[in-house]
Amino acid sequence: MLSDNNHTPVYLSITTVLFRSDIAQIQRFRDCLLESIHQLRSKRLVARVSLAVVDNAASLDGDRHSHIFTRLQGIDALRFIQPEENLGYGRAHNLCLNQGSDFHLILNPDVYLAPDALVTGIDYLRNHPDTGMVTPYGVNDQGKPLFLSKRYPTVLDFLLRGFAPAWLRNMFSGRLARYEMHDEYLSDSPCKTVEIASGCCMLLKTDLLQKLGGFSKDYFLYFEDFDLSVRLRKYALIAFVPDMKIIHDGGHAARKGWWHIRQFSKSGRLFFSRHGWKWL
């Protein structure tokens, strides 16, 4: 529900990073994003919206996606960036940090925003000065909750969630429920005790993101969102806002093959080494 306030319309910047992304998936992403922006404009919440699309596979595959983002109604400025190499997730997003925006949306191309998602998220950030980032309520395409907000993990949580078979995860279901904040995630009220936010959809105050320098360049893939969350919480809160809804058609590194498992493990070790090991 939009608050009754007289805030000046804001500038929203948005970035998404592609890597051999499915065409139909990107088209759905685009259409949902444009509808959510339309809702913002209909309520006169934004004065300007910019979108930057970074195609990390352009150096390998050529230009396969730029045509999807031409003539977008509601977008004031569009940049389609094709790096000469695959920069990884965080570094690619950091190419677009120098924005003069009020709020910045980091969004995966496999995330589909609800029509009122941006209205809800921006309204929350404007009315909560102590909050630097909001994270949404997410489900998969079958409507199953994804628990995108988390508490700081232990190594055991990390191993169970990333690599354990279903029968073993079931044995530790209570433990994983605490890590995934089921108690807060299934409530109807916003929660400001989030310690880790998923990088698939992050809505932040731009000045704070710039102060942090964006994502750490030390993570090529995975855990850059964990690292950013920990650093951000030194300055502001992260809020889970259940009325800000998305569908996320992705994740599950352990199901994507050995290269992804190695990247996941490498980044996990870096994260714990940098921010503290909690074993159990």
Residue ranges and their predicted role:
Residues 153-194:
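Short, flexible, basic/aromatic active-site loop/helix in glycosyltransferases
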Residues 52-66:
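A conserved acidic beta->alpha catalytic loop
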Residues 104:
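Short aromatic/hydrophobic "clamp" motif used to bind/position activated sugar donors
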Residues 186-214, 218-245:
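A short, conserved alpha-helix in the catalytic core of glycosyltransferases
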Residues 82-100:
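Glycine-rich, basic loop-to-helix element that forms the pyrophosphate-binding segment
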Residues 226-280:
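Active-site-adjacent helix/loop segment of glycosyltransferases
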Residues 21-42:
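Short, well-formed alpha-helical segments that are part of the catalytic scaffolds
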Residues 114-148:
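Conserved donor NDP-sugar-binding/catalytic core segment of glycosyltransferases
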